[in-house]
Every structure is written in C-alpha cells, then in structure tokens.
C-alpha cells in the first residue's frame, strides 16, 4: 500500500521514499509513499524522476492498481534493489499546469451546476486545456459565452482554493449552498 502524499500536500515537489517492490520485466517501481498523482477522472498522471545512489530514473507513467501506485521507469539503467532509499521529484511545470487546469474545470462545473443545474457527465484534461460534457439537451454558442463570462467573474473574485476529499454523496449539497 502506497501512502498518497499528493492528497495532503499538492505543492510537494520533492520527497523521500523507500522502494518496496520491483517488476523488473515491466520496469515498474512500487514505493512506500509518493507524491506522483496516478491520473484518473480524465486527468493525466504526473511525471518526473526518481533517484537512488546518484542514479536518476525517468518516471514516464504512473498508474493506480488497487492500493498501490505503479511508477513506470524508462531507460536501460539497472533498477535499485528492494529496500533502497529513493528521492522523488515531480516535473513541477507539468504538475502546476495540471493543477491550474483542474481548478479551472472545477470552477466551470460549479458555475454550470449553480446557474443551470447541469451536472458533468464526462471530461478530459491536458496541460492548460480541457473538455467537459454537461447534461444539456442543447448548448448554443450564446450560452457558451454567458457561461464563459460567469466563470471569468468567479476567477476575478480570487477566492481561496481549499482541497477536500469527500465521498461522492456529499458533493451535490455543496453546489446548492
């Protein structure tokens, strides 16, 4: 089981960890803790580096499997042995752009739900761009401009952003307050 550091500190860029398992064939490292987000819900995973004994390993992909986070390593450098201490470091430019995009998409979802009662049915994001699907029968260009203006007004309000991990059944009441 991997301790998910990103859930308590999304600004953590560098961390110390220990290698707890290795899949040599697939070049996957299992760590006791990580700040690498594995992706999910339309959001891409983090990338960066892991290092051990002054050897750097590029993290190309991160996935969640059960209670574990899998860190896929590129290259042909021999992998460290189980129990080795490691240092992880995020590609911070990528993470920060994903964070900004993620927050903007939450603002969009909040405005659309508050003003039109339409829920999100799907979405996908990349660095500084994203797509959201809403429960609208039809969506005209004029309405898109009205929504965009409302979203920009919310951004201009410069509200504090707080991170909370809630069960799904507690989410909708937040949109009605």
Task: Show where each model-derived region lies.
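Active-/binding-site microenvironments in catalytic and ligand-binding cores
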Residues: 1-177
